[in-house]
Amino acid sequence: MLNIKFIQDNPGLVIEKLKKKNFDASGIVSEIVDLYLQKNKLQNQSDQSKAEMNKISKEIGILFREGKKEEADAAKERTSELKENIKNFDEQFSAIEEKVYELLVQLPNLPHDSVPFGKGAEDNEVVKKGGEVPTLQENALPHWELAAKYNLIDFELGVKLTGAGFPVYRGKGSRLQRALINFFLDEARNAGYEEIQPPLVVNEASGFGTGQLPDKEGQMYHVTLDNLYLIPTAEVPVTNIYRDRIVDAKDLPYKNTAYSACFRREAGSYGKDVRGLNRLHQFDKVEVVQIAHPDKSYEVLEEMVKHVESLVQKLELPYRILRLCGGDMSFTSALTYDFEVFSAAQKMWLEVSSVSNFESFQANRLKLRYRDENSKKPQLAHTLNGSALALPRIVAAILENNQTPEGIIIPKVLVPYCGFEMID
């Protein structure tokens, strides 16, 4: 959530910056500014009424002592009128605050100055490429056919048990999945992240805190009986650990990692890009989260990008890093880097990670602040997170890129975790 004072002081800048996200904020910002002008006017009237009431209250006792009963009674009547006025002002304040809040939560985060203009994925900026795209034999198979051939993943059984987008892993497919999870968690711990095992369902306050609600409510699975939500990412429960907290600046940054199953409705997804593991309703992911000092958050972002890059490098996968344009960024992000790996049989790039700095946007919703010796009052922290990594498309790329006539070669770094070197 944007800072209300920043909007009041810089309405034109907010409107201009949000154009990068293809969001017309002019109406909302104008209404917020007008409402606060009304509030300030009411505040002045309320302050005057309170001052008058305090003055009259002091005079009433004097008037009674001097035997001026009629004047004292008139003064008491005036204080009653003033109390009613103040009550009305307070009610109007509450109504204005509620309306401003409703408007504030509709405004996306402001994009960082380095974010390029653009409408969608085609306008994202490739900032780096790494690894070599493998040359496969002519009859190379896509991962869903390899999964069936080697009995690794049963998509049809998942449909029977639950529905499309809920695959069943088995045999070496399950072991590969578990190997990747453990590898990613070990790498995160080695990078200084504390491991968390969070709940897979969260309440509405948690969903709001990280910005999934109300923006992505239609994409989340909602347990209506208890008003709980299945998490779309471990970012939600892990970041909310710090909700309603004031932390000591010297303890920053906080670094957490978590493995979780993730659940997304992906409403409206269809076509060839959703086949196999390309787009699922339930998938596994390891997440990294940092709570940082505002002065350090972009250094932290670069650190997190390097961490994710090291993972795809160790898996020996061809990859590229993209800086997302304004039109492809999330509601909450100020700057996002996406990682994509190349799927050789499908001949397409697959997103496997997003690493984002949300600056103070989530922290403002979370009421997450820090205190240091230089600030008179607590300040909003910055929050960051990234996928490190999301498994399905990593598995797809490993299966496709490493296929040979003899079988599928397991990346060397995973062999100690898997217990086998090849799927055959």
Predicted regions and their residues:
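N-terminal alpha-helical targeting/anchoring segments
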Residues: M1-P134, A148, L152, E156
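TRNA-recognition modules of translation machinery and tRNA-sensing kinases, especially anticodon-binding
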Residues: S26, K129-D424
